């Protein structure tokens, strides 16, 4: 459960990300594909090279989903319901991959905003990414 402080920390980080969200989404995917190569199996039709148009396009979708979750931080479940259906029923992505994505996103934030990622903010952002992952895997049962 995200506390009021967690929600404020997450919103603060996303305000710093601002117009870079799409780029950070793509960078997160690139990192995930390198660090966790098994995640590539869900993207057999993608050009997975650095800077590819497909990674940029999907990174934009990832970023949009995260921004949507932040914008509806009191109802992440409602905000990501359709995306949860898609991942559970059609794409059938292994739930562990959302943890990988969350970790890679934290790394990207740390690289671009090291001063903003205090231990408290890091913990809040990690809790937020876990909450997003939980919502995206809730309909797998």
Curated annotation (Swiss-Prot):
Q: Give residues annotated as binding O2.
A: 58
> What GO MF terms are annotated?
haptoglobin binding; heme binding; iron ion binding; organic acid binding; oxygen binding; oxygen carrier activity; peroxidase activity
Instruction: Output the superkingdom of the source species.
Output: Eukaryota
User: What is its biological role?
Assistant: Involved in oxygen transport from the lung to the various peripheral tissues.
Provide the residue positions that the database annotates as binding heme b: 87
User: Record's InterPro entries?
Assistant: Globin (IPR000971), Globin-like_sf (IPR009050), Globin/Proto (IPR012292), Hemoglobin_a-typ (IPR002338), Hemoglobin_oxygen_transport (IPR050056), Hemoglobin_pi (IPR002339)
A Pfam family hit: Globin
What is the source species? Answer: Chloephaga melanoptera (Andean goose)
Q: Which UniProt keywords apply?
A: Heme, Iron, Metal-binding, Oxygen transport, Transport
Coiled-coil-forming residues are: none
**Record protein name field:** Hemoglobin subunit alpha-A
Q: Partners and quaternary state?
A: Heterotetramer of two alpha chains and two beta chains.
The record, for Gene3D superfamilies, names:
Globins
Tell me a GO cellular component: haptoglobin-hemoglobin complex
